């Protein structure tokens, strides 16, 4: 296992370096002067000169990259031009809220999706199976923003059960988490069903039944345990996508997470904030994928020797 971990860590190093290079180039690949793009052409010369010195835009490219790497190495992602605060501080305040939303969406998707998949496999062609199939088609077909608007219209405007937007207690979390997790619920239900059908027809399950074990024990301890191995990968990738791709959900529900922070930075041309956010979110996604690989190897020892 230690060798597998070492290999995965070594593979993550060039990926993180590539992320660092892309994040650095974001500030300079845009057409025109990045300083004028942020503050406009009407700014006074003193402000323009100060910002150019802070961003080192007049230095040679290798020197700028070396300076950028040295700052990132100590956790300095720069300073937001709009909030006039360190970008790392802005991220520290907003990322826990995104993590809360992603965790709630993952919990909801896991419980509902896996449960529907198991019940569908236990009774193929039944009512639950047809319901799960229809839910899967709807969940995969509808875009996130459309699902969010439908949920707001139904539960906030029509029924008035839940608030339409904002950040607060559990009531504010339900609709964003359901919106973010709907696609995963649909996909997990179909994947769990397929994996469970294969497991229930396997030789080890027939052996367990021949020994007189009850169907509940056969399903949960034998079939489900093996069927969840491919599901782990999907859960890990979805969780990484929740953390890094919740921009639409946070915008629709006015959730004060890092996704909304990125939208505000883009709309106001805050290039250092965009650069720092992209670097942070990309690193988070790489780390989550690494943890997913380790969890998959733990669940299926065959992966370690491939």
Q: How does the language model describe each region?
A:
Residues 2-3, 89-128, 144, 157, ...:
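Alpha-helical transmembrane segments of integral membrane proteins
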Residues 6-17:
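N-terminal signal-anchor/signal peptide hydrophobic helix marking the start
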Residues 9, 47, 51, 61-77, ...:
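Hydrophobic alpha-helical segments of integral membrane proteins
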Residues 15-66, 85, 156-175:
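Hydrophobic alpha-helical transmembrane segments of membrane transport/permease proteins
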Residues 16, 20, 24-29, 145, ...:
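Membrane-embedded alpha-helical segments of multi-pass transporters/permeases
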Residues 23-29, 59, 70, 134-163, ...:
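Membrane-water interface segments at the C-terminal ends of transmembrane alpha-helices
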């Amino acid at each position: 296992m230690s060798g597998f971990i070492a290999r995965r860590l070594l593979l993550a190093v060039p990926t993180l370096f590539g992320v660092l290079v892309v994040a650095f180039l974001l500030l300079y690949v845009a057409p025109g002067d990045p300083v004028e793009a942020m503050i406009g052409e009407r700014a006074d010369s003193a402000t323009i000169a100060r910002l150019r010195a802070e961003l080192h835009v007049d230095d040679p490219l290798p020197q700028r990259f070396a300076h950028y790497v040295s700052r990132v190495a100590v956790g300095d992602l720069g300073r937001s031009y709009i909030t006039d605060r360190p970008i790392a501080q802005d991220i520290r305040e907003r990322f826990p809220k995104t993590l809360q939303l992603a965790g709630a969406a993952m919990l909801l998707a896991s419980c509902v999706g896996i449960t529907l998949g198991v019940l569908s496999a236990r009774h193929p062609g039944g009512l639950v199976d047809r319901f799960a199939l229809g839910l899967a088609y709807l969940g995969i077909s509808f875009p996130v923003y459309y699902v969010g608007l439908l949920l707001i219209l139904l539960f906030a405007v029509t029924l008035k059960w839940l608030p339409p937007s904002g950040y607060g207690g559990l009531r504010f979390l339900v609709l964003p988490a359901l919106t973010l997790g709907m696609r995963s619920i649909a996909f997990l239900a179909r994947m769990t069903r397929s994996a469970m059908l294969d497991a229930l027809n396997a030789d080890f399950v027939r052996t367990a039944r021949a020994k007189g074990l009850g169907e509940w024990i056969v399903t949960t301890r034998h079939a489900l345990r093996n069927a969840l191995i491919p599901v782990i990968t999907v859960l890990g990738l979805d969780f990484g996508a929740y953390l890094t791709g919740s921009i639409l959900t946070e915008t629709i529900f006015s959730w004060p997470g890092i996704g909304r922070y990125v939208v505000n930075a883009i709309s106001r041309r805050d290039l250092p904030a965009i650069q720092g956010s992209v670097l942070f979110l990309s690193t988070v996604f790489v780390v989550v994928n690494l943890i997913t690989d380790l969890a998959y190897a733990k669940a299926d020892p065959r992966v370690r020797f491939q």
